[in-house]
Amino acid sequence: MGHGVEGRNRPSAPLDSQAAAQVASTLQALATPSRLMILTQLRNGPLPVTDLAEAIGMEQSAVSHQLRVLRNLGLVVGDRAGRSIVYSLYDTHVAQLLDEAIYHSEHLHLGLSDRHPSAG
């Protein structure tokens, strides 16, 4: 699969069932408000679990559980720093995916569209 939007490195072929399942798992991870809040906070930079929990107003154990799910899906990484684990987004693709989801939601809310003129 490729990377990008609007003609920039689009996938060269339709998704097969395995790739479709992987994409669905990623999108399911984004379908949980608490995970979106975590990813949005990490969009601003790496944080240890304690700071992340405080920033989004969740219990540390709940944040740790959600981070484990996000890590297993390849959306975040954790690096040990002394006795803490500092989490960050896996890469810029995760930030772009998050940005596009937020952008799309805002456009729907405002009744806007970025449809190409030939899209009818």
UniProtKB/Swiss-Prot annotation:
Q: Which residues bind DNA?
A: 49-72
Q: Which UniProt keywords apply?
A: DNA-binding, Metal-binding, Nickel, Repressor, Transcription, Transcription regulation
Recorded GO molecular functions are: DNA binding; DNA-binding transcription factor activity; metal ion binding
Residues binding Ni(2+) are: D91, H93, H104, H107
Ranges where the HTH arsR-type domain occurs: 15-109
Q: Which residues form a coiled coil?
A: none
Q: What is the effect of changing D91A?
A: No change in activity. Lack of regulation by metal ions
**Where does the source fall among the domains of life?**
Bacteria
Family matches, as CDD domains = HTH_ARSR
Effect annotated for changing H116R: No change in activity. Lack of regulation by metal ions
Q: Which Pfam families does the UniProt entry name for this protein?
A: HTH_5 (PF01022)
Q: Which residues cross the membrane?
A: none
Q: Which Gene3D superfamilies match?
A: Winged helix-like DNA-binding domain superfamily/Winged helix DNA-binding domain
Q: Could you say how this protein's activity is regulated? A: Binding to DNA is inhibited by nickel and, to some extent, cobalt ions.
Functional note: Represses transcription of ctpJ/nmtA, by binding to its promoter region.
* Alphabetical list of PANTHER family matching this protein: ARSENICAL RESISTANCE OPERON REPRESSOR ARSR-RELATED (PTHR43132), HTH-TYPE TRANSCRIPTIONAL REPRESSOR CZRA (PTHR43132:SF6)
State the oligomer form and interacting partners: Homodimer.
Protein name in the entry? HTH-type transcriptional regulator NmtR
- What is the species of this protein? Mycobacterium tuberculosis (strain ATCC 25618 / H37Rv)
